[in-house]
Amino acid sequence: MANCKVIAVTNQKGGVGKTTTTANLGIGLAQQNKRVLLIDADAQGSLTLSLGYPKPDELPVTLTDIMQNVINDTPIPDGCGILHHGEGVDLLPANIELSGMEIRLINAMSRESVLRTYINAVKPHYDYILIDCMPSLGMMPINSLAAADSVIIPSQPSFLSAKGLDLLMQSIAKVKRQINPKLKIDGILFTMVDSRTNEAKEIIASLRAHYGEKIRVFGTEIPFSVRAAETSGRGKSIFAHDKNGKVAAAYRSLTKEVLELERKTERFRVDAAR
């Protein structure tokens, strides 16, 4: 793969499986021999915690320091702040200090592209960079969308989650118009799906009908599972925790869909260049 693809995993609603998806998709891609960097762009540090760093506030270098260096135009040494996870992915961690970055960005030069500046510098080392976005529509998520090639939107199949999707679509469209014209939506991913309930089935069917013509809805659905919830904070992916379970199978399937998307894009690029 010649180019590094940057994917923002985003939804302004919390608790929809963003962090779990970022970690497991990233590790799924690493299992397919892709070089992967995961960026925790959420001040709660959920991705950092879930990958086995229980005290993110004690880490010497986090995304906040990296972004501050970009703002100050200070050189960033190769590999600075990057942690190597046992399942083959790299992590740029975050902690509560990132909440102050929102305020600092307001007065920064080229404030929307601070994260993009850093990502462009590390792109040559990776095939995929996945960003776990903050659940808001502030300056940090805008930085993530400005840096991304595409967006994956995890969403629970509930009416409240569905209502929030339209607002998120408007924000993505605005970033695309004003800051990052190449930004596209890879798809909506249904997470925490309890297929036993009729409500979930009805909402999924109506959302597939509503968005399906304009926006891809991934064929893979991530099922609700107590075992998946247990992995959070253990520092392991679902593959290491329960490799034969239904959630691991679903994330393997999602990984295949994401890789196939890239193959189609690559084929289209080659055909267009002929």
What are these language model-derived features?
Residues 1-274:
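P-loop NTP-binding core
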